[in-house]
Amino acid sequence: MKITEGYMPFKGFKTYYRIVGENTEGKKPLVLLHGGPGSTHNYFEVLDKIAESGRQVIMYDQIGCGNSFVEGHPELFNADTWIEELIELRKHLGLDEIHLLGQSWGGMQAIWYAIEYKPKGIKSYILSSTLSSAKLWEKEQKRRISYMSEVDQKALLDAVNTGDYSSKEYNDALERFMEMYCAGEVTEDSPECLRRPKKSGSEAYIVGWGQNEFSPTGTLSGYEFTDRLHEIKEPCLVTSGAIDLCSPYIAKTMYDRIPNSKWELFEYSRHMPFVEENEKYIKVLTEWLNAND
C-alpha cells in the first residue's frame, strides 16, 4: 500500500502529514484529527486498512507534537491555530471534498470547524469519543472520580485544589483513572504504532487543555457548543466506548442534538474503540463512509 509522507510550511514551522493509499473516483478521502492536544497521529495507523478499499486516509501531527513538534511558543496552542492548520492542509493537498474524523480533542476541533467556519466539501463528520462542552466533560470526569477509592479521590482533588500535581499519590491515582477510562498499558502485543516512541506535545496539552482530563484551565476551557450542535447539517456519526472518558451521557448529548446523526456505542472499549475493537470499528466506519460519499 502506497504511503506518502511530507511537510507543509506553517507559521514559520512545519506540519507533518501522512497519506495512505491513492484516490479512487467516487471515494472521498478520510482526514483524521488526533486528540490531545498533543497526542500525535501514531495511533491512527491502526486505521490504515481502510485505504485497502480504495479510500485515501490522511493523518497529520498538529503543530506542537510528533513530527510537527514545537515548544516555547505557547501563543500557538489554541483553536484558531489548529483550525487554521487544518484549513491550510486542505488547500496544500487539494482536499476539496473529504470525510472528517476527529477523536477526543480532534472531535472538538471538528465541531468548532463545522459550526464557526461552515466549511464546504465535508461529506460527513465522524465524532469519535469527543465532547461538545468542556464543562460537561469536567463534570463527568469528576463523577467518575467519585467511584474511585477515597485515597485516590483525595489525591486527585487535592491536586486540583492546590495546583500541585507533583505528588506520587496524585500521579499514581491519575494513572489508575486513565487506565480505567482511557487506555491500558502498551505491551509487546500492542500494535507497532502504539509501541513506537513518540514526541508528545505536553506543552500543547497543558496550554490548550490543562493538567489533566478533569481540569480544563487552558485556552480551550471555554469550549461550549452543545446549544449550537443543531447547526451541523452534514451527516454525522458519533462513536464512543462503554467505559470511555466520553461517557455515554456525553455521547448522547451530541447525538440528541445533531439533526442528521447516528451513534455507535462500542461495548468493550474505553477512549479508543478504533484500537480496542479495531475490526468492528473499521467495519462500522467503512459502511458509514460508503453510504455518505
Swiss-Prot record:
Say if the entry is tagged with keyword Metal-binding: no
* UniProt-listed InterPro entries: AB_hydrolase_1, AB_hydrolase_fold, AB_hydrolase_sf, Peptidase_S33, Pro_imino_pep
Recorded GO molecular functions are: aminopeptidase activity
Catalytic residues? S104 (nucleophile), D244, H271 (proton donor)
Q: Which Enzyme Commission number(s) are on file for it?
A: 3.4.11.5
Any one cellular-component term (Gene Ontology)? membrane
UniProt GO BP:
proteolysis
Using the record's annotation, list all stretches that form the AB hydrolase-1 domain.
28-277
What keywords appear on the UniProt entry? Aminopeptidase, Hydrolase, Protease
User: Pfam families, from UniProt?
Assistant: Abhydrolase_1
> Which reaction is recorded as catalysed by this protein?
Release of N-terminal proline from a peptide
Q: What does this protein do?
A: Releases the N-terminal proline from various substrates.
PANTHER family in the record, alphabetically?
AB HYDROLASE SUPERFAMILY PROTEIN YCLE, MONOACYLGLYCEROL LIPASE
Similarity annotation: Belongs to the peptidase S33 family.
Protein name per Swiss-Prot or TrEMBL: Proline iminopeptidase
Q: Which organism was this protein described from?
A: Clostridioides difficile (strain 630) (Peptoclostridium difficile)
Coding gene? pip
